[in-house]
């Protein structure tokens, strides 16, 4: 009888602990790859402007949709009419950084050589 009481008590303690302490949640990084086409006679600066807007929307949407996301990495690739595709910008930002300053231009890395390759 002593063993049954001991096992019953430990089972009750385990059940109580499981109810009080929920399972641990894990934070993670959201990764997004976006592709934009450089339109006929469109200046490269316009493509960069569109890339900034797309990256900003992607980052905001990622943080809004999932509270466990702690960091967002977005790569924007541009493609010209000849089928040449090159990275235009890469945005890597934490939730805390984004909440303090949600500005793509502040956190993004721009690839300067992309303009020459796409035009």
Question: What name fits each language-model region?
Answer:
Residues 53-62:
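N-terminal post-signal-peptidase region of extra-cytosolic proteins
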């Amino acid at each position: 009888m002593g063993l049954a009481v001991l096992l019953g008590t430990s089972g009750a303690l385990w059940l109580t602990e499981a109810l009080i302490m929920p399972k641990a949640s894990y934070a993670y990084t959201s990764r997004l790859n976006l592709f934009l086409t450089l339109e006929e006679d469109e200046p490269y600066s316009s493509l960069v402007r569109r890339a900034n807007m797309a990256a900003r929307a992607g980052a905001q949407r990622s943080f809004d949709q999932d509270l466990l996301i702690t960091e967002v990495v977005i790569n924007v690739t541009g493609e010209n009419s000849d089928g040449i595709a090159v990275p235009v910008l890469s945005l890597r930002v934490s939730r805390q950084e984004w909440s303090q300053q949600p500005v793509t231009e502040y956190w993004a890395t721009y690839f300067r050589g992309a303009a020459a390759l796409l035009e």
